[in-house]
Structure formats: C-alpha cells, structure tokens
Swiss-Prot record:
One of its GO terms (cellular component) is extracellular region. Transmembrane segments: none annotated. Glycosylated. Keywords: Calcium, Glycoprotein, Secreted. It is found in: Secreted. Residues 8-45 form the Kazal-like domain. It comes from Cavia porcellus. It comes from the Eukaryota. The lineage of its organism: Eukaryota, Metazoa, Chordata, Craniata, Vertebrata. InterPro entries: Kazal_dom, Kazal_dom_sf. This is Caltrin-like protein 1.
C-alpha cells in the first residue's frame, strides 16, 4: 500500500480562478484531485 505524499494531499487554491475563468489555460500540468481523478492542470480541476 502507498501512503499519500504531501504533494498529492495539497488542495489547490481555486479562489484565483473564480472571477477569472477566462484566464484558464489548456497547458498540461497534471494535478491529482481530492476525488482521486487526475486533471490536466489546476485551472481545469
């Protein structure tokens, strides 16, 4: 069994995207969501 690492357990701060969703890019920078799914980047998460 694997223990979650610190990197995987950090939750992204989505507040910077709330008012500026149009600034979300499609750059690939995978992030693991708290739901166990991998998202393309923090903005898409």
């Amino acid at each position: 069994a694997f223990a979650p690492s610190k990197v995987d357990s950090d939750r992204p701060n989505c507040s910077r995207y709330v008012q500026h969703l149009y600034m979300c890019t499609k750059e690939l920078d995978p992030v693991c969501g708290t739901d166990g799914h991998t998202y393309g980047n923090r903005s898409i998460f």
